[in-house]
């Protein structure tokens, strides 16, 4: 029974982190769809704040043992790749 609860907490923690990562991904995709200048100070501030917040959430979940460190790193890496693609798309515009 206790192991089922731990697994449930881990699944919930990972699902919440993925949901937060998806919100950031949507911000990036909106910018890509519109090719809005990624150097906009407001855009950068919002995205930086969101990415920092997610990294802290992931760190907390890892420290609690709810999320594997590699899973957390992969979530951030995926967002960083998308952000890099946005910058590449804008510079080729």
UniProtKB/Swiss-Prot annotation:
Xref: Gene3D superfamilies: SO2669-like
Signal peptide segment: none
Domain of life: Bacteria
Pfam hit, one: DUF1507
Residue ranges of the TM segments: none
Family per similarity comment: Belongs to the UPF0358 family.
Protein name: UPF0358 protein BLi01701/BL02974
Organism: Bacillus licheniformis (strain ATCC 14580 / DSM 13 / JCM 2505 / CCUG 7422 / NBRC 12200 / NCIMB 9375 / NCTC 10341 / NRRL NRS-1264 / Gibson 46)
Source species taxonomy: Bacteria, Bacillati, Bacillota, Bacilli, Bacillales
């Amino acid at each position: 029974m206790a192991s089922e609860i731990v697994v449930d907490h881990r699944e919930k923690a990972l699902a919440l982190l993925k949901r937060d990562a998806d919100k950031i991904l949507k911000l990036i995709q909106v910018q890509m769809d519109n090719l809005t200048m990624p150097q906009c100070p407001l855009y950068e501030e919002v995205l930086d704040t969101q990415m920092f917040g997610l990294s802290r959430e992931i760190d907390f979940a890892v420290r609690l043992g709810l999320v594997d460190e590699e899973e957390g790193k992969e979530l951030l890496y995926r967002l960083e790749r998308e952000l890099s693609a946005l910058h590449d798309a804008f510079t080729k515009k």
